[in-house]
């Protein structure tokens, strides 16, 4: 009987070791999920060149403003209005007269900027994207067909193709202790060197109403974040 119990205990320990090893392997795979290649379809943004040569999407954040100024100079006058020095708006886009738009900014074809939207600058709004009532954008790239339609804050963030933020969900971009943001995945850590870092959303991500994405949040493709969550941990694809 004693031998049987000891043997069972050893089996349990072995299983725990095996499970722990599997978890570590999964964590390493998850970290790869947060690269640009695994998060984003670069064919679904006018800002494709901004991401070239980089590994993680947050690496583009310090360069968005300068990139817009360079890219804007290359846009067709037949397709884009240029109402001020650092603002380009596609002629097919719909912009409410009550929207506040500060450059540098590019608003893509068929995009919609609704009543009282506030674009603070350094923003790229993709084709067919929606920036809604009282939504605020700052230093952000919205890929094509992104929707931030109701009372959202999107600062220092990248939102992948067809991602959607429910009403009142926000990207918190500064830690309360004002320290630099670190992306964590299990025991793995990546020092970003950034004080302001909102969220990185992969393609086809759904964020539920009223959720808060804390600084350094990275969400893999096709993930669903439930409503009213305070969310920090990275999410692998399809979770």
Predicted regions and their residues:
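Single conserved hydrophobic/aromatic residue that forms the stacking wall/gate
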Residues: 1-14, 231-239
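Short, intrinsically disordered, charge-balanced linker/junction segments flanking boundaries
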Residues: 2, 25-28, 223, 230
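Short, Lys/Arg-enriched N-terminal segments with co-localized hydrophobic residues
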Residues: 9, 14-29
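Extended, small-residue-rich solenoid/repeat segments and analogous flexible loops
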Residues: 42-118, 122
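Flexible, glycine/small-residue-enriched loop-and-beta-strand segment within the central core
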Residues: 72, 101-107, 113-207, 211-213
């Amino acid at each position: 009987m004693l031998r049987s119990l000891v043997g069972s205990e050893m089996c349990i320990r072995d299983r725990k070791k095996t499970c722990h090893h599997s978890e570590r392997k999964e964590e390493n795979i998850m970290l790869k999920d947060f690269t640009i290649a695994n998060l984003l379809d670069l064919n679904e943004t006018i800002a494709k060149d901004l991401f070239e040569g980089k590994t993680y999407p947050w690496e583009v954040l310090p360069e968005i403003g300068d990139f817009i100024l360079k890219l804007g100079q290359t846009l067709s006058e037949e397709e884009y209005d240029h109402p001020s020095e650092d603002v380009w708006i596609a002629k097919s886009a719909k912009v409410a007269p009550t929207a506040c738009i500060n450059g540098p900014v590019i608003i893509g074809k068929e995009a919609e900027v609704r009543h009282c939207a506030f674009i603070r600058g350094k923003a790229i709004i993709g084709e067919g994207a929606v920036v809604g009532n009282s939504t605020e954008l700052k230093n952000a790239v919205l890929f094509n067909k992104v929707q931030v339609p109701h009372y959202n804050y999107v600062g220092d963030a990248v939102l992948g193709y067809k991602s959607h933020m429910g009403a009142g969900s926000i990207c918190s971009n500064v830690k309360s202790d004002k320290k630099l943001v670190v992306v964590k995945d299990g025991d793995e850590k990546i020092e970003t060197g950034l004080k302001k870092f909102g969220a990185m959303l992969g393609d086809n991500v759904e964020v539920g109403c009223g959720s808060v994405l804390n600084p350094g949040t990275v969400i893999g493709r096709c993930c669903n974040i439930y409503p009213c969550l305070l969310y920090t941990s990275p999410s692998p694809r399809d979770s």
